[in-house]
From Swiss-Prot:
The lineage of its organism: Bacteria, Pseudomonadati, Pseudomonadota, Gammaproteobacteria, Moraxellales. Homotetramer. Forms heterodimers with either ThiH or ThiS. Its EC number is 2.8.1.10. GO terms for biological process: thiamine diphosphate biosynthetic process. The gene is thiG. This is Thiazole synthase. CDD domains: ThiG (cd04728). It is an enzyme of class 2 (transferase). GO terms for cellular component: cytoplasm. Transmembrane segments: none annotated. One of its GO terms (molecular function) is thiazole synthase activity.
Length: 261
């Protein structure tokens, strides 16, 4: 069965796995893991990674060239709307007018849970300034709807806390967000292993974004390959339509036409 592309804002993608660039041991490992993942969208923390701000330091764009990947600047490390807006403005300047950004405004350093009040404020400002916003948010369906109605091009509810590896803790609310949404819904944060990615896709999500699950694995390149397969398998399972759940057994062999009685 031929799948449709993933459409985010004005862009089209074949891969439904998005990856980050943090926590790798060096740029070579970063490069190899991203290649193994098959990802087309690579997210970059503007406040933490050099993409041209410092000419004396290694430039991440040497291994993720913008002509090969869609670079998705993110506002990781921002705890209020103003700093998130400033970070997006810097990203646009560094990337020659690039308007697609991942907005995340965090509530505290312990949980890195999204501050939805500041997120809404920043999203409104950035959308008014012409940005296409993919937004990290809680798994609250009402907040997700509000972010979509104001013009965000993708909703990215957390599966569980950033870097926790706890998987999809509230699949029911993720499902509600997806059912209500008219823009792509991508699970962002909390994926720990391939089965978590497959579950997110089986719920009907349009994609999964991850970083630590790959970078912190004992073999990041192999894990990146596993995540690619998991996202593809989960997507195919969703499109195929799972069998209904039943309380009692239902024999797979026919009850008539026995050879022996």
């Amino acid at each position: 069965m031929q799948d449709t592309p993933l459409i985010i804002g004005s862009r089209s993608f074949q891969s439904r796995l998005l990856v980050g660039t943090g926590k790798y041991k060096d740029l070579n490992e970063t490069d190899l893991a991203i290649q193994a993942s098959g990802a087309e969208i690579v997210t970059v923390a503007i406040r933490r990674v050099n993409i041209g701000q410092n000419p004396d330091q290694p430039n991440l764009l040497s291994v993720i060239p913008p002509e090969k990947y869609t670079i998705l600047p993110n506002t990781a490390g921002c705890f209020d709307a103003d700093s998130a807006v400033r970070t997006c403005m810097l990203a646009r300047e560094l990337l020659d007018g690039h308007n697609l950004v991942k907005l995340e405004v965090l509530g505290d350093e312990k949980t890195l849970y999204p501050n939805v009040t500041e997120t809404l404020k920043a999203a409104r400002t950035l959308i008014d300034d012409g940005f296409e916003i993919m937004v990290y948010t809680s798994d609250d369906p009402i907040i997700a709807q509000e972010l979509e109605s104001m013009g965000c091009v993708a909703i990215m509810p957390l599966g569980s806390l950033i870097g926790s590896g706890l998987g999809i803790l509230n699949p029911h609310t993720i499902s509600i967000i997806k059912e209500n949404a008219k823009v792509p819904v991508l699970v962002d944060a909390g994926v720990g292993t391939a089965s978590d990615a497959a579950i997110a896709m089986e719920l009907g999500c349009d994609g999964v974004l991850m970083n630590t699950a790959i970078a912190a694995a004992q073999n990041p390149i192999l894990m990146a390959s596993a995540m690619k397969k998991a996202v593809e398998a989960g997507r195919e399972a969703f499109l195929a339509g799972r069998m209904p759940r039943k309380r009692m057994a239902n024999a797979s062999s026919p009850e008539t036409g026995y050879f022996f009685k």
